[in-house]
Swiss-Prot record:
Protein name: Large ribosomal subunit protein bL33c
InterPro entries referenced in this protein's UniProt entry, alphabetically: Ribosomal_bL33, Ribosomal_bL33_CS, Ribosomal_bL33_sf, Ribosomal_zn-bd
Gene: rpl33
Keywords per UniProt: Chloroplast, Plastid, Ribonucleoprotein, Ribosomal protein
HAMAP family (alphabetical): Ribosomal_bL33 (MF_00294)
GO CC aspect terms: chloroplast; ribonucleoprotein complex; ribosome
Origin organism lineage: Eukaryota, Viridiplantae, Streptophyta, Embryophyta, Tracheophyta
Family classification: Belongs to the bacterial ribosomal protein bL33 family.
Subcellular location, principal: plastid
Native source species: Carica papaya (Papaya)
Record Pfam families: Ribosomal_L33
Alphabetical list of SUPFAM superfamilies matching this protein: Zn-binding ribosomal proteins
GO molecular function, one term: structural constituent of ribosome
Compartments where located: Plastid, Chloroplast
Alphabetical GO biological process terms: translation
Length: 66
């Protein structure tokens, strides 16, 4: 039998430096990654350092609402 809600949910990670600077002349968009997290182990918002192809460097990508 299944237990209540699923613990694993799909989330979207978005580049914080692209969002903070706005879409300036250098960048053509905002980097987003799709991944999963376990709601029981990490109830808070997830932040990971990932490569942003628009900034051309590794930046912090934070979880956003769908």
């Amino acid at each position: 039998m299944a237990k209540g809600k699923d613990a694993r949910v799909t989330i979207i990670l978005e580049c914080t430096s692209c969002v903070r600077n706005g879409v300036n002349k250098e960048s053509t968009g905002i980097s987003r990654y799709i991944t999963q997290k376990n709601r029981h182990n990490t109830p808070s918002r997830l932040e990971l350092r990932k490569f942003c192809p628009y900034c051309y460097k590794h930046t912090i990508h934070g979880e956003i609402k769908k």
